[in-house]
Amino acid sequence: MAHKKLLNIRELMETLFTQGLITPSQMKRIASKLEKPAEESKDPLYIRILSGVGAWVGALFLILFLGISHLLRSDTSGIVFGVLFLAGGIVISRASKTTFLNQLSLALVFSGNILFLMGSVKLFQVFRTFNLSTLIIAHTLVVAVAYPFFSNSIYRFLAPTALVTLITLWILDEKVFFLIHFLIAVEMLFAGIMLLLKKPKASLTPLIYSAAIMLPLTILFMNLTQVEIGRGLGRWGEAFREPLWPSSLLLTAGLIYLYFRLAGGLKQIRNDWMILAVLATILLGVFTTPGVLVAIGLLVIGYSFDDHTLTGLSYLFLTCFLVLFYYALNINLAHKSLVIAGSGVVLLLTRWVLGHMRFERVNR
């Protein structure tokens, strides 16, 4: 009886590539995944969340202690203590990796960041030139200095997130609402560049997840202002009425580019499934909220890179945006039910068509 030849991984990938079942970019991604050394075990997500909450509470008590001790009386004391706390936290984190000292360093950096912002506010109030742009500049300066030297992933995630939040608040406070689309464009480009890096450094991982979360959150806020729920946001929700179509146009183009980038280039336009994906994306961009496009983009990247965190985020945001989309439809309840049922049928039909096409291709 003849023995079958056993293929190694490289030969198997070459065979699949010859049969047209995988693309060169997928081969590179698989190879880099196999060659990547095993990472050190990290704390579970809930442990890191609890650690961040504990450090935040500790930072508040440190600031409260300074206030009670009357050490923040002068106009520059906040900046001075902020710099000292930031430097102390960075030195402690680089000197020792024990749990207690890591927690202490995180609390010091949190409190130093807050104190630096408070000191900047107090200093600029003396010159009567304070506005939210002062906080943005001060926080950007702190993040630019602390991020490379302070390796705590919790701070590296929260600091950029806070920066985008401050920029959004500035847009609302200054009533330059059209800039929200420029912010979304910058977030989309930045998130795309970060998520599509071939071999991202470990130090960039928190920044990548921060970008992946802030883009849909910005669009979610913009969506909320378009419906009755937005009235509960106060004067910002009542004044903010920016149309969604510019962001939809940007995100549609970005999502189509993502398809071709992951599939191996423009040559894939000849494939039936790519034509179907592009047409479906254009229709979604025309008829739905831009948040659905972002959720689909996260879902595609999550599946492509086997990132369960991004996949989970995509499902979460997709649910939120679909609920908002159907809630905002200006039709009666019966028609909404028909639209939801029809959407489900279309999705099931699309899945069946793609599965049938893939089955035929494998058989060939």
Please describe what each predicted stretch is.
Residues 2-364:
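Alpha-helical multi-pass membrane segments and their bilayer interfacial helix-loop junctions
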